[in-house]
Amino acid sequence: MPEDNLSGDGGPPVDIDISVEAGDWPDEAGLARLVDRAVDAAFAETGVTGRSELSVVFSDDAHIRTLNAEWRGKDKPTNVLSFPAFPFAQGGPLPPMLGDIVLAAETVSREAALEDKPVQNHITHLVIHGLLHLLGHDHETDAEAEAMEAIERAALARLAIPDPYA
């Protein structure tokens, strides 16, 4: 069984605030375990060290659609959005607050069903994906997408979760 604390420094790299605001999600304690493991795995793969804070909001399609329209000009729900609190340059020091990751219940569940994977695995992947955005990664170009997906695959492999891109 993979260890829950993969950062190796005796504690989690970030103080995580979890909020279940809307939608049909697993219990909050289960979500907290998924998020903790996802964050530890992402930090282990990126080599980022230090301490920070992170907010993860579990919401629904209606809420994320509003956020997506307001912040990205896309009037439709999406699976995950990330909102950095401060600019973060890869290789730089962690800011005191990384930002917010927001997930949408209906979209996450629908995608997991379509891809025939456990919803917990999909949640874990999306938390890692959202966190990588907060850590300065993106997927606007093919090269960026390949680099980001490689980190996601490696972080998920640490947790014995199959490659979501296979």
Swiss-Prot record:
Zn(2+) binds at H129, H133, H139. InterPro entries: MetalPrtase_cat_dom_sf_prd, YbeY, YbeY_CS. Its cofactor is Zn(2+). GO terms for cellular component: cytoplasm. GO terms for molecular function: metalloendopeptidase activity; RNA endonuclease activity; zinc ion binding. Its main location: cytoplasm. It comes from the Bacteria. Its EC number is 3.1.-.-. It is found in: Cytoplasm. Keywords: Cytoplasm, Endonuclease, Hydrolase, Metal-binding, Nuclease, Ribosome biogenesis, rRNA processing, Zinc. Binds 1 zinc ion. NCBIfam families: rRNA maturation RNase YbeY. Single strand-specific metallo-endoribonuclease involved in late-stage 70S ribosome quality control and in maturation of the 3' terminus of the 16S rRNA. Belongs to the endoribonuclease YbeY family. PANTHER family: ENDORIBONUCLEASE YBEY, CHLOROPLASTIC. This is Endoribonuclease YbeY. The gene is ybeY.
